[in-house]
Curated annotation (Swiss-Prot):
The keyword Nucleotide-binding does not apply. The gene is mcrA. GO terms for biological process: DNA restriction-modification system. The lineage of its organism: Bacteria, Pseudomonadati, Pseudomonadota, Gammaproteobacteria, Enterobacterales. It is an enzyme of class 3 (hydrolase). Residues 207-257 form the HNH domain. It comes from Escherichia coli (strain K12). This is Type IV methyl-directed restriction enzyme EcoKMcrA.
């Protein structure tokens, strides 16, 4: 898991959500050696900004490196700030981050020291008192991307999210092996906008069946292709990248209604490596 910037680009800042030594929160991995997690400071700025935007005004921050945890057994000893809480308001996220990192300089690998020096980008655990929600921290890590990536059964909302997601740098999403069914006047399925956006992004505007360019461009500037589930959702198909293709409208209709649709589907499996039966 990594922190994302406000453009949906994954930063080189590894993190995780969970509990360590009885404390639940966000764990931000240290910077180093070399370029490992080199976006630590930028990521921490985003984390602070999003916490404040979420209404959080104070946190508790602990050092969480393996060496410190080994030599400093008391949680209170590993709390980096002198007061009970570390405040997030009153300054810019950058200034608050500099203060937070400055406290880290009072710790060596084995304990506290009187004169600050050395690494100010150590592995830390950020705790928000009273918060025990993975989804809360996921929204802090991902920013706007967290909301945009939520599956939905609303076609217009799905397409709005896809329109925004397709402009971002996306890693291949997991999708859903068993999409949620929603009963309306007709049965519909909750769709993952990340899957649809990634498929369209990978196609680069070219139909994955006939190889021709998309027939036109949408108002948002994206080429118009339709995402087709090779095994239909109504037949138990997954809403995942290994069951989806980007097609021009003509090929899409052909796969649904042509008398040789089965042969066309088999050719998709032959020609597109990511597809799985």
């Amino acid at each position: 898991m990594h922190v994302f910037d406000n453009n949906g680009i994954e930063l080189k800042a590894e993190c995780s959500i969970g509990e360590e030594d009885g404390v639940y929160g966000l764990i931000l991995e240290s910077w180093g050696p070399g370029d490992r997690n080199k976006d630590y400071n930028i990521a921490l700025d985003y984390i602070i900004e999003r916490l404040v935007d979420s209404g959080v005004s104070q946190v508790v921050v602990y050092l969480a490196s393996s060496s410190v945890r080994k030599h400093m057994h008391s949680l209170d000893e590993r709390k980096i700030h002198p007061g009970e809480y570390f405040t997030l308001i009153g300054n810019s996220p950058r200034d608050i981050r500099l203060k937070m990192c400055g406290y880290q300089a009072y710790f060596s690998r084995t304990g506290r020291k009187e004169i600050p020096s050395g690494n100010r980008t150590k592995r830390i655990l950020i705790n928000v008192p009273g918060i025990y929600s993975d989804s809360f921290w996921a929204s802090i890590i991902r920013g706007e991307l967290s909301e945009l990536s939520q599956p939905t059964d609303d076609e217009s909302l799905l397409n709005m999210r896809v329109s925004k997601l397709i402009k971002k740098t996306l890693s291949q999403p997991e999708g859903s092996r068993k999409p949620v069914e929603v009963e309306r006047l007709q049965k519909v399925y909750v769709r993952d906008p990340m899957v649809k956006a990634w498929i369209l992004q990978q196609s680069k505007g070219i139909c994955e069946n006939c190889g021709k360019n998309a027939p036109f461009y949408l108002n948002d500037g994206n080429p118009y292709l339709e995402v087709h589930h090779v095994i239909p959702l109504s037949s138990g198909g997954a809403d995942t990248t290994d069951n989806c293709v980007a097609l021009c409208p003509n090929c899409h209709r052909e796969l649904h209604y042509s008398k040789n649709a089965k042969e066309l589907i088999e050719m998709l499996y032959v020609n597109i490596n990511r597809l799985q039966k």
